[in-house]
């Protein structure tokens, strides 16, 4: 606040989750002055990931796009972009990377999960810390049902769901919700079988694109009799950014090709197409990530 800067100067200020902070939101601190008219903050450090989801902006792209050549020259291409992204873009364009650093040690994802996003989105630069859960091997599942065996054998898996007919409500998918509940049951059984009880309310996260599917999944979890089902977080990928769970299940939900745009947020970054929604969804998982959806429709993306 202005009152604070009248009595104290700061050597440095950190902006965390900087890729979600728009320039007007940062302006007050960037321009802060002391009573003597000096800069109240000596320097700024921006920490964020422009390959994950940006700030939520309700205005359409046609209204946020910047077409002024002089503004484009300073990296201002879209007012929906964060200052972090603009400064990073300018640095990469200049070929001078002195002011850009990469925190490439990650302690969240098991390497089997991280491998995909590392290759597709991060140029192979990510490395595990490694923490104990990142060194775990697959759990044995002798005599288990096929779904439990699938959960035991993969850390990054896809389950194809093809309903007999498209759902009447195109924002809810009961067949996928059923599979999500079955998969949660399989994880509970698998870890219980190996003497490692899990609490789904703390360990399992479910990502869906629509509010209608949230209600559908919650209903199926409760019908399945899953312990503390009402406390399992079922939400959109935007709401999951910044959080993590041992197991993430992503119910894509869509049943019609025209809905594909809802699932992705593709941005051209560093010469590569980065799907920021998919990146966020996968990187929430510590031990396993499962995607549930209609393969034929999803392959159209």
What are these model-derived regions, one by one?
Residues 1-301:
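Conserved helicase motor core of SF1/SF2 NTP-dependent helicases
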